[in-house]
Amino acid sequence: MRRPLFLALSAAAALAMAAVPATSALPAATAAAAAGPCATVTTAPTYTHVIWILMENHSFSDIIGNTAQAPYINGLASECGLATNYHNISHPSLPNYIAMTSGLSGRAIKPFDSDCSPSKKCSTSAPSIFGQGETWKAYDESMPSNCAPANSGEYAVRHNPPPYYTTLAGCSSLDVPYTQLATDLAGSNSLPAFSFITPNLINDMHDGTIAQGDTWLSQNVPAILGSSAYTSGTLAVFITWDEGSGGYPVENCAAKTSDASCHVATIVVSPSTPAGTTSGTLFNHYSLLGTAEQLLGLPRLGQASSYPTMTSAFHL
């Protein structure tokens, strides 16, 4: 397994994190973010920015309560919000990425069951959350060039939805390598309304360990929460997993509560989410889509209108 490179870490920080290496493309977090990111306001503001961070292939029970391997994730869940009855849509990865960004279901996501690369048979002309009237970007760690349509090293195109949408305008300029996020966070108005963040295969826990993914999040999420978009109260962040572990046969997971491979953790981080909030409401990736659409004033796509959003449960 290759060691990810550190970007601009100080010598002291590098020594402290050497046991579990991870890549950070972001500037150091501010002291304000380190003090606790949630419950900084009592009234939900008007959110104009939403960030999703997609991790890979671990069930709820793999992550929540696993403080030995995932101390940062569990700490963030206790400081902010945790959906305890949240489900992926299917297996394997790609149907979930397409479903959560388009609202497609059933036969419409079946062409993606093989985790195929974009092609005539493995694509869709359906609308997606990307470019529904809002600004957007997808930030993909280790992607060699914008809107890359093929796997390369630790970049997996199946974890990057935009290249699969044939009618989507802007993929060549808005589906970008992850390093661009640092620049967009630093700018006064450069962070888009909707951001989709995909760590590489090591840091998203697909090929790497839970501990490596946790360390990556611990190095990157605090900088997001220290950005002006978050500290000004306009940004909500959602961390979720594409699917649970061990669920290789294709199945309908959206409302299947009996299968651990359909049950994943989802953490909600926002200034208006009370610390320690949990919700046992049945949510899934369609709920996440509907939540982003509701916050950003976008039309509901497909199955996003069939499931409850997370706004009320997490005081968004």
Tell me the role of every PLM-derived stretch:
Residues 27, 33-316:
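Flexible, surface-exposed loop/gating regions in the mature catalytic domains
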Residues 5-7, 15-37:
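C-terminal region of N-terminal signal peptides and the immediate post-cleavage residues
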Residues 1-2:
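N-terminal secretory signal peptides that target proteins for export/translocation
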